[in-house]
Amino acid sequence: MATNAQEDEPASTTKPLIGVVGPCAAGKSTLIAGLTRRGYRSRHIAQEHSYVKDMWQRLTRPDILIFLDASHPTTCSRRKLDWTEPDWQEQQNRLSHARANADLYLDTDKLSIEEVLDEVVTFVRSRIGD
């Protein structure tokens, strides 16, 4: 099986740090795994669990902030979450500062894993001139 050499590159400290935020089951962990395979430095920022609105800035200080979003029904179907619409809305409220300051916002409801990764990589490359 042929592999894309780019996917196997180790993450370089010369590449920007990409912060990824969003509600539970929006695709953050999957995106981070894909970015890592392609040689990018990325980190999940658990802003959805914090009442400190700018925690994403204080702890991580990402060069690029990606906000992945998903609707309440989608999050429930992806992870079989047993949470209510108000629970989901509370996460949205906790994420409002990060969403307002995100460099890229993606609604992942209708996107495949590959589409999310491709859109983010295209965006990051346009920002860093890669």
PLM feature segments, named:
Residues 61-78, 106:
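Conserved phosphate-donor/acceptor-positioning beta-strand/loop module used by diverse small-molecule
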Residues 20:
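Hydrophobic anchor at the beta1->P-loop junction of P-loop NTPases
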Residues 27:
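Conserved glycine(s) of the Walker
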Residues 2-10:
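Pre-Walker A adenine-sensing motif
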Residues 81-119, 130:
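Small-molecule kinase domains that catalyze NTP-dependent phosphoryl transfer to phosphate-bearing small molecules
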Residues 30:
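Conserved Walker
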Residues 10-12, 23, 33-63:
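Conserved substrate/cofactor phosphate-moiety recognition/catalytic segment
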Residues 3, 45-52, 86-89:
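Short gly/ser/thr-rich secondary-structure transition/capping motifs
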